[in-house]
Each structure stands twice: as structure tokens, then as C-alpha cells.
Amino acid sequence: MNTEILGVILQIVLMVALAYPLGKYIAKVYKGQKTWSDFMKPIERLIFKVCGINPTEEMNWKQFLKALLILNAFWFVWGMVLLVTQHWLPLNPDGNGPQTPDQAFNTCISFMVNCNLQHYSGESGLTYFTQLFVIMLFQFITAATGMAAMAGIMKSISAKTTKTIGNFWNFLVLSSTRILLPLSLIVGFILILQGTPMGFDGKMEVTTLEGQEQLVSQGPAAAIVPIKQLGTNGGGYFGVNSSHPLENPTYLSNMVECWSILIIPMAMVFALGFYSNRKKLAYCIFGVMLFAYLAGVGINVYQEMNGNPRIDELGIAQDGGAMEGKEVRLGAAATALWSITTTVTSNGSVNGMHDSTMPLSGMMEMLNMQINTWFGGVGVGWMNYYTFIIIAVFISGLMVGRTPEFLGKKVEAREMKIATVVALLHPFVILVGTALSTYLFAHHPDFVASEGGWLNNPGFHGLSEQLYEFTSCAANNGSGFEGLGDNTYFWNYACGWVLILSRFIPIVGQVAIAGLLAQKKFIPESAGTLKTDTVTFAVMTFAVIFIVAALSFFPVHALSTIAEHFSL
């Protein structure tokens, strides 16, 4: 047990320690300063030349968003075409068939919005070609899209008064070539050393310990797993994600993959401080996020290592903790750490089944996604926190009788309205979606039965499974309580639309706020200025997040996870 706890502590320390220098490097990349990765410039110039892009051309916030949305729309069409025709394409040694239109729609939307809501199993639902040229490609593009959006916001808040927020295409390419690609190569090399397969052969026939013949899927897993983690996408190469012994073979590979989930989201907070020369602000934001993260880790590690009281009643020893749905080679503590790490970000990968975690652990996993501001996805995580900063600034200003300001710019009704819509959209789509699915389940059983039935676990846990699915979609996370039968018309289309709304409306709103504030006249700090880089304001922001985001979900948790906890 002590060894497992030490492993958890070591991983967290490594994340924090390495995020700081990486954040400094990221800020230099976006500022165009000299870095060790300047050898990539010829490749970047070639990309810009082939695509007809002038990387030095500045964009206003509307042009920036237009480029972002056009890029995503193009790749959505690309993905749809490839997924429904994948059985005709090369690199399909196992003869896997095409995806149905509704499943392809869900898959494309999911990966286009940097989610990994997989209503299919990777071994049989995709080919090597679509794994590489749809899934892996999307994992680079969508991660770089979020990072580019944050780079634009960092540029806007760093300038005193400006009508432009940088060039989307330039930030997109730099995010890919200077940050995501180098880190992916390092992680991929480590995974290959640990035993993750990298090749294009078909299924391998092996003889099990029982003497039975079994076919084991392989393929280019080591190329895809690094970016799935670093880009906070989380889409597993294999159906059971990083629980699979070939996707995550050893405790070392588990540490590296878990580290990869959080390193860039953490670094982006520090990058904000270095880019804007406001390190104290970055430290305050990082402190709030880290506090929430550590609280979640503590609760889940405690819950999972103490085991299941129902099993205790049977007189069965649980020295390893609550091991249902967990890998013996990893243990309960490492699985609990991963469950929080993957849900405070938009990653969604798993190294154990969240459906099998203790009820309060499941509640913490959902609350992380329902709050959706602790580190979050690469780029967009801080942007969600930025929304609540605007709300907190406005409320704080009203409370003390000062004009609401953030970084020398007045926060007025227009920005506040946008921030409010973005903040309320998240609980709205989750709760309305869950209400619709539970209504259909209770009052239209024939429809549910026609889709094969949805729930394997009725009662409190059945509600949790439906709530988790919509929560995961809205947070662009993609993990799931897999007792839910979700590869149906209802879940594919309902989740697809939630994914679209929850990805693009917040990005549009957050970039719009940054663009509107950037155009305003800069007001120098004075004795009457509300300081946003203090512990007091950090606590205020945390309180606003807790009240607006967390409390919206406590009634439904009282009927699901909390009720299930007290029923044990």
C-alpha cells in the first residue's frame, strides 16, 4: 500500500515540476522567440507555402474564429467519408467492415471536438488506415486547435489595446510541430521500449496458459497512444483503452501515460504567466486548479484502496482495495489517480473501468467534468476557467462598488452576457439530456427495447450511467460508465449534438470575450483596481465556480451516486 501511495505522489510531483519549464518553452514558441526547436522552421514554411497561408497576417477575433470553424468542418467531412468506406481502403489486414452512418457521425463529431466518446471497439470498429488518417490525425488537429485558441487569447490579454489576436494558422502549426509532435515522439519511444506494438501486421495467433488458441490484435498502437494522451483526447487504440496490456503494458508505461495527460494543460497555465508577464496571476490560477485536483485524488485513492463494504460483509479480504474493474499490474491507487487525472482534463482515457469504481469515486469523476475548469483540455481548459474569471470579476466589482476590470480592461454587460451563456450552457445540456433519456427509459420502454435496451444496471446506478454519458459529452471527455448500451441511434445522435454545442459555443464565446476586451482602452492599475492575482480573488473565483457549476448538479447526484453510496 505504501508503495502504491508513493507512486501516486511521485507522478504528481513530476507533473508539477516538469510543467513549469514546459510552460516557459510554450510561451516562447507562441511569442516567436528563439528556441531549440527552430530547426522545424523549414518544414513550417513548406506547410504555409503549400497551403497558401501568410503566417504573419494578423486576424481579428471574427477572422480567427472563422478559420477555426472552417478547419473543423472540413475534417469532419473527411472523417465521415473515410469511416463509412474504410472496408475499401488499404491497411485492413483483419478485414474490418465500415461504420454505419450514425456511428460514423458520432465518431467524427467526437474526435473533431477533441473527445473520445467511442461507441465502437478499436480492434473491430476501425482499420489501421482510419486509426492513422482519421483518429490520430484528428487528435493532432483538435489538440492544436484548442492550443491555438488559447494562444490567441493570451496574445489579446497581453496587449494594451489591439484589434487583432494573432494568426490562427500560425498558432495551429506551431502547436503541432513545436509542442505536440516532439513530446509524442518521446512518449512513443518509451512505450515501444515497454512493449507497446508498432507495426501493420494483422492479428497474431497465440496459445494461452489454458492451451487455447486466441487471436490478439496489434498494429500501430505506439504511434497513436502518445498523442491520445498528450492532446487530452483519450481515444483508445484498443477497446478497453489503457487497461489493455498492449496499450499500457507496465507500471512505468502507466506513469508515462498518466503524466502525459496533464503535463500540457498544467504547462499552459504557466505559459499564460510567461506570455503575459503576469506570473503571479498564473500561480493563483494554478493553485486553485491544483487544490481541486489534489482533493479529488485524495478522495478517490481513499475510496478505492478501502475496498467495497459489500465484499467485506462476505468475509473476503481486500488487501489490494476495490479491485473490480482494475488491472492487477497497476493496482487500485494508480487507477484512482488516473480516474481523477483523466476527468480534470478532457482526456477521457481509462486504465480501469469507471463503472466499477465506488459511488463517491464516480461522483468525483463526474463533478470534475461537470465543473470542467480544473486544467481541462489542452488550451480550452484554461479558457473555461477564463469564463469564470470574467464572472468573478463582475460579481466582485459589484460587491465592493468598483468598476469590474480584468487586466486593465473594463468588463461590461456584453462580456458578462457571453460569459453567462457559456457558463450555463454546460449544466443545461447535461441535465436536459439526462432528463430526456430517463423520460424515454421510464415512459417509452418499447422505443428503448427497439434499440436493444440501454441499461444493464437499473436503479441509482442506471441514472448515474446516463448522467455520466451526457456529462462526458458536454465536457468533451469521452470516458463512460460502460454498463450503458450506447451504440444506438438515440445515443449516437443525442451525444453528437451535445458534443458540437459544448465544444464550439464556449470557444466562440471565450475568443469573442478576449477580442472585445482587447479592443478596449487600457486602464492603468490604481489603488482602486481590483487585483486578480491575489489569494483572495483566487478564493472568490473558486467560490463562483463551486456555486455556479458544482451546486447545479447536487440534486441529481443525490438521486444517483450519493444514494448508491448510502445503499451499500
Language model segments and positions:
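N-terminal alpha-helical transmembrane segments of multi-pass membrane transport
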Residues: 1-106, 161-166, 170-207, 283, ...
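Membrane-helix cytosolic exit motif
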Residues: 22, 395, 437-441, 506-519, ...
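Hydrophobic alpha-helical transmembrane segments
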Residues: 66-76, 138-148, 257-269, 381-395, ...
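Selective recognition of specific alpha-helical transmembrane segments in multi-pass small-molecule
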Residues: 68-82, 174-197, 261-264, 273, ...
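P-loop potassium selectivity filter motif centered on the GYG triad
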Residues: 90-134, 197-259, 312-380, 448-501, ...
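A conserved hydrophobic secondary-structure block that centers on an alpha-helix together
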Residues: 126-200, 252-283
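Alpha-helical transmembrane segments
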Residues: 270-276, 398-412, 512-533
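C-terminal catalytic subdomain
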Residues: 387-391, 396, 400, 418-457, ...
